[in-house]
Amino acid sequence: MHEPLAFVPGALAQTGRVALVTGGERGVGAAVVRALASRGYAVAIHAHGSLQEARVLADQLAAAGVPSLAVTANLRDEGPVRAMVQRVADHFGRIDAVVTCAAIRHAGPLEEVTADDLRTHFDINCGGAFVAAQEAGAFMVRQPEGGGIIMMGDSAVDRPRTGSAAFLASQGAIPAMTRSLAVEFAAHNPRVRANCVLSDAAGHREGTVEHVAHAVLFLLENQFINGICLPVDGGGPLA
């Protein structure tokens, strides 16, 4: 079992790389933020309804010598999402990674799910992730070093559970979107890669958010992996 990544204030070697993490203020997103910081990334932390939490985390990183920025945007609205990515690029001068951790999950019985519920899940979980990746990828294409896109999905799309019909429908689009982005960006710059992490760490008794963060680092750092969906679920489907 992986131990949480070491985070020693003042001891981080900066690499000049910059990452944007949507939904980075708590949970898996915050673990990804800390993991990226431990690898020398400057980090932009996105939040919407909980921007203050993102600011607190950004302040903690700054105190440890990590360049950081708290940003906000409603992921349902294309314009603000594009403006957020542009702000990150303007602030740091580049974008090397984007990790889309933000998602909503409204649980409830199938008979109570409305078309509006479904649209809301797709707008945020798919539309917001797509626009953030599309906009950030446009910056990466222009960089000789390229960059990495990580879409966060849910491994439960292959073994659905009750009460999550709208959420899992939106998550089912993530693998296809990842593969499409991988092909599209590689046609412009083969150093721009898009991959997906299918996480169910929270549903496994030994799973932690750090396990997911380690997978994100692996996919970002391996330059020869593109267009895959990596399950991080403790072998759940084999049980």
Model-derived regions, located:
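Active-site loop of short-chain dehydrogenase/reductase
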Residues: 16-17, 66-67, 94-95, 140-154, ...
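Conserved glycine-rich cofactor-binding loop
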Residues: 25-26
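Conserved glycine-rich Rossmann-like NAD(P)H-binding loop of the short-chain dehydrogenase/reductase
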Residues: 41-55
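Substrate-binding pocket helix/loop in short-chain dehydrogenase/reductase
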Residues: 109-110, 117-122
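A short, exposed helix-loop element centered on a Lys and neighboring polar residues
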Residues: 133-134, 179
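Catalytic loop of short-chain dehydrogenase/reductase
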Residues: 150-173, 178-187, 200-204
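C-terminal substrate-recognition "lid" of short-chain dehydrogenase/reductases
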Residues: 208-232, 237
